[in-house]
C-alpha cells in the first residue's frame, strides 16, 4: 500500500527552543541563500569545533569552486561521550568566522540530527540534507562520519562513484585530501600539494587531538586553533 499527501511537521523537538539563533530548516536556509544572492554554495558538515585545517579547507573549496558562499552546518543532536557541547561549538565557530572570513561569505546554521557514524552511507545522507538546503557542493574529507579505523580513509568519497547512480543527486562533492599545518609555509595545506615537504615539516591536525588537549586542560596551540577559538574552548 502506498500512501501520499501533504506533509506537516508537528515539532522540531528541542532544537528550535534550545538553539533559536542556529537551528534552521532546509527551506529557511534556501530562503537565506536566495536573499544573499548566492548561486554556488559549498556545505561543510561538522560535529566538532573547527580547527585550522577545517577553516582552510572551507577557504580552499570556495576558491577552487569559485563559490559565492559556504554553509557551515553543525550537528545539534547526540554525539559521542567527550565531544564538545553544541553551544560551545556554535560560539567558537561564529568567533572564527567573524575574525577570519570576509563578510557575507559564510552562513552558520545547525540541524537537528544525531551522529550515526555510518561512514560512507552517512556521507550520502549528508549530501541529500545539503542538497535539500540548496547547496551545490558538500565537502567530504578523510573518514567522513567514520569511527575509529572501521571504514577506509576515503570510502566516504568513493561511494559516490561506486554506489550512487549518475544523476541521482543534484549536489556534487568536493573531495578533500589529507590536510596539515606546514611549518615551512606557516599555513595549512593539502599534503599532496607540498611534495617538497618531509614528514617532519607537517603538524597533523585532528578533532580528536583537540579534544584530548582540552580534556587535559591544555589550550590547543596556534597551529591547531585560532587563539580566539582556543580561549572559548
Language-model features, listed with the residues they occupy:
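Active-site cores that bind ATP or allylic diphosphates and position pyrophosphate for catalysis
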Residues: 1-49, 53-233
